[in-house]
């Protein structure tokens, strides 16, 4: 496993693999790796000849007052975690390498139908920054397939839309959420919580499961379900329930009539930790 820090070196390595007819996979991360990231790595390693994991804390997707400076940088531990897992290269550039010689505002990518609601409303500009860095990574590594986790469900749909709309030649693979035994979705930000906050945190998943169960049992009063769920989160000790929302799976639009599948999404804060999660509901026709 080699570590690459320069864009041109990563391009040359990928193109050498491609010239030999090898299939390339990419797992984009911001580091501080946990079992959820390693699941992405292991799933993709079985499908490709060469696997690249990128580790880059992308400044473009952090807004003013967010945790860019505080976000954990654990490169040595991450490299150790990736050893022996079928990873051929770790692409770990710094911000100057990824965004050389330019000052903001950078070129943006706008997906208005998917980015102005839910987490996009709470974090203006976040998904534009995600889209830019993902496109850059895809252009640098030139993978045949890239893996993203379902936990960041809105991000996953934004990336799928960008790849489709811009005719990018890459397959996007969705990997299921990895959870703790009590249901909490694994996240690099879970470490922000103290012991009491960590004990409260599984209520987000439990609440979304209740919403999904109500939908599967026949309830269709979306707004009332969402409001009840937010009240439950606040009663469970969350500092703020940013949203609980029932949406169509593909475009995150509000449901219209009968839908075979819906996704229940939520975001809530416990101290410095902003937790997100989602649960799918399969509806009876």
From Swiss-Prot:
**Reactions that this protein is recorded to catalyse:** (R)-pantoate + beta-alanine + ATP = (R)-pantothenate + AMP + diphosphate + H(+)
Entry similarity comment: Belongs to the pantothenate synthetase family.
Gene Ontology cellular-component terms for this entry are: cytosol
Function, please? Catalyzes the condensation of pantoate with beta-alanine in an ATP-dependent reaction via a pantoyl-adenylate intermediate.
Identify a single GO molecular function assigned to this protein.
ATP binding
Chief localization class? cytoplasm
Q: What is its EC number?
A: 6.3.2.1
Q: Name one GO biological process term.
A: pantothenate biosynthetic process
Q: Which InterPro entries match?
A: Cyt_trans-like (IPR004821), Pantoate_ligase (IPR003721), Pantoate_ligase_C (IPR042176), Rossmann-like_a/b/a_fold (IPR014729)
The residues that hold (R)-pantoate are 61, 155
Which NCBIfam families does the annotation name? cyt_tran_rel (TIGR00125), panC (TIGR00018)
Q: What is the protein's quaternary organization?
A: Homodimer.
CDD domains, per database record: PanC
Q: Where is the protein localized?
A: Cytoplasm
Which additional comment does the entry carry? The reaction proceeds by a bi uni uni bi ping pong mechanism.
Pfam annotation, one family:
Pantoate_ligase
What is the protein's species of origin?
Halorhodospira halophila (strain DSM 244 / SL1) (Ectothiorhodospira halophila (strain DSM 244 / SL1))
Swiss-Prot/TrEMBL keywords: ATP-binding, Cytoplasm, Ligase, Nucleotide-binding, Pantothenate biosynthesis
Q: Which pathway, per its entry?
A: Cofactor biosynthesis; (R)-pantothenate biosynthesis; (R)-pantothenate from (R)-pantoate and beta-alanine: step 1/1
Which positions are catalytic residues? 37
Q: Where does beta-alanine bind?
A: 61
Residues engaged in binding ATP: 30-37, 149-152, 178, 186-189
- Stated name of the protein: Pantothenate synthetase
């Amino acid at each position: 496993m080699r570590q690459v820090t320069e864009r041109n070196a990563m391009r040359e390595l990928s193109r050498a693999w491609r010239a030999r007819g090898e299939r390339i996979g990419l797992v984009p991360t911001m580091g501080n790796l946990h079992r959820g990231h390693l699941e992405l790595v292991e799933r993709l390693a079985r499908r490709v000849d060469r696997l690249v994991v990128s580790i880059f804390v992308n400044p473009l997707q952090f807004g003013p007052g967010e945790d860019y400076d505080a976000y954990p940088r654990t490169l040595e531990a991450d490299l150790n975690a990736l050893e022996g897992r079928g990873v051929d290269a770790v692409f770990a550039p710094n911000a100057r390498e990824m965004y050389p010689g330019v000052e903001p505002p950078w070129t943006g990518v706008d997906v208005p139908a998917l980015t102005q609601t839910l987490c996009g409303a709470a974090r203006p500009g976040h998904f534009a920054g995600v889209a830019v860095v993902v496109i850059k990574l895809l252009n640098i590594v030139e993978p045949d397939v890239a893996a993203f986790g379902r936990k960041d469900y809105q991000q996953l749909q934004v990336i799928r839309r960008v790849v489709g709309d811009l005719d990018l030649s890459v397959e996007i693979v969705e990997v299921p959420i990895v959870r703790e035994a009590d249901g909490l979705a694994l996240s690099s930000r879970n470490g922000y919580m103290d012991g009491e906050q960590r004990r409260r945190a599984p209520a987000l998943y439990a609440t979304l499961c209740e919403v999904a169960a109500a939908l599967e049992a026949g309830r269709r009063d979306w707004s009332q379900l969402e409001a009840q769920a937010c009240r439950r989160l606040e009663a469970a000790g969350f500092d703020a329930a940013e949203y609980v929302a029932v949406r169509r799976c593909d475009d995150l639009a509000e449901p219209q009539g009968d839908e075979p599948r819906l996704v229940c999404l939520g975001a809530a804060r416990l101290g410095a930790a902003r937790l997100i999660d989602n649960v799918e509901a399969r509806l009876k026709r």
